[in-house]
Curated annotation (Swiss-Prot):
It comes from Mus musculus (Mouse). This is ATP-binding cassette sub-family C member 3. Residues 310-593, 967-1248 form the ABC transmembrane type-1 domain. Residues 626-850, 1287-1519 form the ABC transporter domain. Keywords: ATP-binding, Cell membrane, Glycoprotein, Lipid transport, Membrane, Nucleotide-binding, Phosphoprotein, Repeat, Translocase, Transmembrane, Transmembrane helix, Transport. ATP 2 binds at residues 1319-1326. The gene is Abcc3.
Amino acid sequence: MDRLCGSGELGSKFWDSNLSIYTNTPDLTPCFQNSLLAWVPCIYLWAALPCYLFYLRHHQLGYIVLSWLSRLKTALGVLLWCVSWVDLFYSFHGLIHGSSPAPVFFVTPLVVGITMLLATLLIQYERLRGVQSSGVLIIFWLLCVICAIIPFRSKILSALAEGKILDPFRFTTFYIYFALVFCALILSCFKEKPPLFSPENLDTNPCPEASAGFFSRLSFWWFTRLAILGYRRPLEDRDLWSLSEEDCSHKVVQRLLEAWQKQQNQASRSQTATAEPKIPGEDAVLLKPRPKSKQPSFLRALVRTFTSSLLMSACFNLIQNLLGFVNPQLLSILIRFISDPTAPTWWGFLLAGLMFLSSTMQTLILHQYYHCIFVMALRLRTAIIGVIYRKALVITNSVKRESTVGEMVNLMSVDAQRFMDVSPFINLLWSAPLQVILAIYFLWQILGPSALAGVAVIVLLIPLNGAVSMKMKTYQVKQMKFKDSRIKLMSEILNGIKVLKLYAWEPSFLEQVKGIRQSELQLLRKGAYLQAISTFIWICTPFLVTLITLGVYVYVDESNVLDAEKAFVSLSLFNILKIPLNMLPQLISGLTQASVSLKRIQDFLNQNELDPQCVERKTISPGYAITIHNGTFTWAQDLPPTLHSLNIQIPKGALVAVVGPVGCGKSSLVSALLGEMEKLEGVVSVKGSVAYVPQQAWIQNCTLQENVLFGQPMNPKRYQQALETCALLADLDVLPGGDQTEIGEKGINLSGGQRQRVSLARAVYSDANIFLLDDPLSAVDSHVAKHIFDQVIGPEGVLAGKTRVLVTHGISFLPQTDFIIVLAGGQVSEMGHYSALLQHDGSFANFLRNYAPDEDQEDHEAALQNANEEVLLLEDTLSTHTDLTDNEPAIYEVRKQFMREMSSLSSEGEVQNRTMPKKHTNSLEKEALVTKTKETGALIKEEIAETGNVKLSVYWDYAKSMGLCTTLSICLLYGGQSAAAIGANVWLSAWSNDAEEHGQQNKTSVRLGVYAALGILQGLLVMLSAFTMVVGAIQAARLLHEALLHNKIRSPQSFFDTTPSGRILNRFSKDIYVIDEVLAPTILMLLNSFFTSISTIMVIVASTPLFMVVVLPLAVLYGFVQRFYVATSRQLKRLESISRSPIFSHFSETVTGTSVIRAYGRIQDFKVLSDTKVDNNQKSSYPYIASNRWLGVHVEFVGNCVVLFAALFAVIGRNSLNPGLVGLSVSYALQVTMALNWMIRMISDLESNIIAVERVKEYSKTKTEAPWVVESNRAPEGWPTRGMVEFRNYSVRYRPGLELVLKNVTVHVQGGEKVGIVGRTGAGKSSMTLCLFRILEAAEGEIVIDGLNVAHIGLHDLRSQLTIIPQDPILFSGTLRMNLDPFGRYSEEDIWRALELSHLNTFVSSQPAGLDFQCAEGGDNLSVGQRQLVCLARALLRKSRVLVLDEATAAIDLETDDLIQGTIRTQFEDCTVLTIAHRLNTIMDYNRVLVLDKGVVAEFDSPVNLIAAGGIFYGMAKDAGLA
C-alpha cells in the first residue's frame, strides 16, 4: 500500500501508529485517507449491488414520475462523477507535465467516478421500479459523508500547520465533493411521491410503512402517528390500516396450499413407487417388512412457503449476534484504559462513542429481525387457519363425525396460535449454538483452557433438560386431549342448554366439565413444575459456568490472577451466554407444544376428502339431467353400503318424487347426487347447476335477504317472486326489520317452518337447473304446503320446466309428479308414474290403501279428482290380489316401515323440520323474538371492545384468585434473587480489586465460596418463585374457569339467544388458554425485568454517582415512551380479541352447512368470506407487532444512552474510580437495554393478556337466572301431588322494552286433566311452556301448581318436578344410560322398564354395549323416532304429576306417534298433561282444549263444545278433516 501512495511531497506512508493512536491529536495519514477511506463507500455499494438488483427485479411497485427531487439527485450524481473525472484528468495532466503523481491519485478518482455513475443509474432504476426511499443509497451517501469528515478536518489542520495549501486544486475539488455528497445525503432522506399503477394508490387507508423513508422504517418512526392517536383516544377499527397485498390471506394461504400440494404429490409418488411390483421371489415377498405409508410433511410445506422470510430473518439475526460480541471487547479496552493513567483521554471518549454506536446498531438490526420474524409468524398463523378452513370444506362425512366442530375450532384457535408463538424462537436453533461457541472462544482468549470447564457444565446439563422437555411433551399431548374434550362438551352444552334447563340437568354436566377440567389442570400443574425445574437449570447454568470457570482458573495455576478485566469481560460474555441458555427453556417448551400441534394439524389435513369426480358434470345421455348407473354408495369406507346398485335416469324438466320407509336411503340418494357420499362403484352424472334444500334448514347469521340471495346479485323481480311463492311476505310484516332482520345463529329466531321456507326461497332465487328438495314440506302446515307445491314445486309452479327431485312423505302431491322412485333397503324397489305403480300393486299401492284416508280430506279429494282412473284401478286391483295380506311377513314388514315413515299433514301452524339438527337450535317457537330491536332488526349484539386502562380491579381479581399471600411471596422471592445477584457481582468486583490493591490474591477460597453461596441462593430463590407461581397460577386458572362455567350454566336462555356460541366458546378456549399457559410466564418475566432494571440503576449510581445527573431525564423519556406504547398496544390487543371471535363463529357455521355450500357452488365465496374475517383480525395484529418494534427501538435507545453515560462518566472520573467499579458499572449498563425493553414489553403483554381475565370476568358476572334452590322456601316432599296448574292474570314479555307475548292469561287446569293447547304461529303456545318452567319470568300475575306459587321456589325444585317431551329430541354424546339418567338416581331395572314402555328395549338389547351404547353428538347415530322415544323414556323415569308435550310428535312418523300417544295414555293416566299440538287428532279425546290467539285466551272448553261453537278451533278441525 505504501507504493500505491508514492513518495515525494504529496506521498506518505499508509499507516502511522504514532500519528493515529499514540497522540493527543489523532489523525490518519494522507495515503490512508486517499485510498482505503475513500474506497469504503464504493466497496459497500458494489457488494450490495447484486442482491439489491435481484430484489428490485422481483418487486415491481409501480412507476414514479420524474420529479424535481429525482432530477436533483440525478444531477448531483452526474456532478460527482464529473468531479471524480476532473481529479483523474488532473492527475494525467500532472503526469504529462512530469510531476509524477502517486498511483492512488489515478486509482481513487477512477473507482469513485465509476461508483458515482453506478449510483446515478441506480437512482433512475429505483424510480422505474417504484422505490420511494432507497436504504441502499442512503447508507452509501452516509458512508461517503462519514469517510469524508476525516479528510475535511485533516486538510484544514494541515493547511493551518503548514501556513499554506500544498495542493490547491485537489483541496478545492475535495470540498466540492464533500458539499455534493452532503447534499445527496440530505436529498436521499426525502421520499419520492407514490408510484403510479400501484395497488397502494387505490387504498383509502394504506399502511404508512409502505411509503416510509429508510430511517423511518429503520426506527419504526412511521408508527408514531398511530401511537399518538392511541394515546389521545381509544383506537377504533376505522383507525387501522389496510393490509398490504403480501399479508392478505388469499396470497399467503395460496402459497402454503401450493407447497402442501407438492408434499402430497411427493408422498403419493413415493407410495406408488413402493407399490410397483418388481417380481421378487415368494420368500422375499413373505419375509419383506411391510413398508410404512409415507405421509406428506406439513412442516416441510411450511418451511418451503416461508423460506425467504426465514433466510432474511436469519441474516439479521446473524449480524445482531456478531454485534453482541463487540461491546465486551470494547469493555476490555475501556478497563485497560482506566488502568493506564498515561493513555490519551480521547481513547475513552472514542470507546464510549463506539459502545453507544455498537449498541444502537445492534438495536436497529435486532428489531428489523424481530419485525421480519413476527410478520412471518402472523402470515404463518393466517396460512394455517386458511388451510384448515379449506380442508373443512371438503372433508368426508365420516371425518366430520370423528372431528367435531369444537376440535376443529381448537386447531384454528390454539394450534395455529402455537405456531405463531414459537416462530420468534426458531432461529435459536442455530444462533444459540453460535453464540455459545463464540462466547467460549472469547472466554478461551481471556481465561485459557479453564473455559473448557464451563463447556463441560453446559454439555452435562443439556441431557438433563432434554429429559425434562420430553416429559413435558408427554404431558402436553395428554393435556390437549383433555382440552379438546372440554371444548367439545362445552359446545354440546351451549347447543343443548335449553334442554338442560328444562330437565334441570345442569349440575350433572357441570360436574362432567369440572372433572375434565380437573384432569387438565393436573397435567398443567405437572408441566408447569417441570417448566420451573427447567428454568432453574438454565438460570443456574450461566452462573455455574462462571463459578466453575473462574474457580478452575484461579486454582489451576497460582500465577493466574483474577483482575477486573478478566472478571468483568468474562462476566459480560457469560451474560451473553445467558441469553440463549435462558431462552432454551422457552424454545423447548414452544417446540414441544408446536410439535404436538403440528401432528394434530397434519393428521387433520391428511384426512379423506370428498371426491370431486364422484359426480360427473359433462358426460350424460342426451335428454337427461341426472343419471345413475350401477351406483353403490356408503357414508364411510369402513361401513357397509347404504345404497346398492342404483340405476336411475331423470329427464330434463321432470318432477320426480322419492318415497320409502325410514332408513331406506331417500336422503342418502340426494346426498349421493350432491357427491356427499363415497361412491364405491358406478357412474353418477348431473348436468347443470344445482340448488339444494336440506331436511335441516341451514340458515346463516346474517339478514333474511342475505340468506335468500346467498351471495348472488340482487334481482328485485326474482327476489320478490321467491318471497311470494315461498309464502314469506306475511312473515316480513311480522319481523322487526322486514327482510333486513338479522337472523340469529342457526336461525334461532325463526320457527321451523320459517327456516325451511327461507331455505326454499334461497333455492328458488338461485334459478338453478336442478333442484334437490329433501322433504321441504314437512315443516309447514297443510295450506302452506299446498301453496308451496302449487306455486313453487308443482307443474304450475315457478320451477316448472326445471328438473326437480322431491323427497316427500305426504301422498296428496304424488299424482302430480312425472314419476315416483320408491326406495326400500337402499335399493330402488319400484319406479314409475303414479298410475303405473298403482297397477303394479306393490308395497306402494299397499301403503296407499291403508293410509290414504288419513290424509287431509280436501287434498285427498283433489287427488281423487286428478287421478280418478288410478284410484278406481287401485280398488279393483287390491280387491283381486289375495297375496297382499297381513299374514305375509315380508309384505307386512314393508307396510310397517311405510307406516313409520309417512306422516299425516299437520292441521295448523308450522312444525319443526322432521330431521332434527345435529346441534340443538331451539325447540320452542319465538313469538316475540327476544332480542329484536324494532329499528334495526338486529338480534346478535356486537361485541364491544373495552377502552382505556385495564381496571385495577382486574389485577386485584387475579391476585385474589392466586391468593394474596402467594402473590406477595412471589414478589419477595424475586426481590431476594435480585439482591443475591447484585451481591454476587459486587463481591466479584471486590475480588477482582484484590490484585489491583495487593498485587496478588489472598483468601481465594473465601472469595470463591461466598460467590458460590450467593449464586446458589439466587438459583434457589428463582426456583422457589417459579414453584410458587405455579401454585398460584393453577389456583387462579381453576377459580376463574369455575366462575365462568357456573355463571354460564346459570345464565338465562335469552343470553344464549343473543350471544353467538362461538363468542362464548372463545372465552372457554382462547381466553382460558391465556390464563392457563401464558399469564404466569408473563408475570415472571415482568418481575425479572423489573428487578433487573432497578438493580442495574442502583449499581451504576453506586459505582459512578455522577450518573444521577442523567437518571431523571432518561426516566422521563422512558416513562413518556411507556405511556404512549401501553395505551396504544392495549387497545390494539383488545381490537384483536374482538375480531378473533367472528373467525371461529363463521367457521362453526360453515362446517354445519358444508353440504349446502358445496351444492350451490359457493365454496370459493366462503373461502373469501373467511379470508376477509381473518384479514380483519390481522389488521389489528399487524399494528400490534409494529408497536412492539417501535417500543423496542425507542426504549433501547434509552438503554443505549445508559451505556453511553456510564462509559462517559467512567472516563471523566477515571482518576477516582478503580477498574473493578468501572467493570461492574459498564457490564451492568450493557444488560439494562434488554431489561428496560422487556419490562415495558411485559407490562404491555401483562395488560394484553390480563384482558383474558377481564373477558372471563365479564362473562362470569352476567345476569343469572333465579337460584336453583331456595333453602328457605323448598317445595314440600312429593310436590305436586295432584298436578293442578293455574295461570292467574299472567303476562310475560321476553325482555324489558318488548311487547307482551302473553296478556292477562287466566287458566285453571284440574289435576289429572288432559289439555291441548293450539293456535296459529306466534299465538303464544310455546311461551306458556317457557313460563311454566320459568325459562321466562312473569311481567305480572303468577303461576300456581297445587297451591304453590312457582316463583317462590328454586328453579330446580320446580323443573325437576315437571316433565317435558320437547319437539327437538336432543341427545348428548355419551352413553345411553347417561342420556336417560345423568345423575345415576335410577336402578338398572327402572331404566330397562322405561325402555320397554317406550318400545326401545329391543333396539338397546340388540346393541353389544346395551345401556352403555355410545350416542354420537346430538344423537346423530339414532333416528329421529328413536331419539324421541329416548325422550319418552326420560319422562317415564321421572314420572312427575305434570307432563308437557311441546309438539313432541310433529316431526315423527305415524307409528312412533301412535307408540308415544298410547304410552302417555296408559302411563300418565293420572297425571296432568299439557300438549301443544299441531295434529289435532291427537288431542280430540282430551278433556279440554285451550285456543290462544295473539297472546290471549280465545277459547277454552272441551273439543266437542268448541266444534259446536263454530269458533277458531272449529276452523282448525275443519281444515284437518275432523269437523
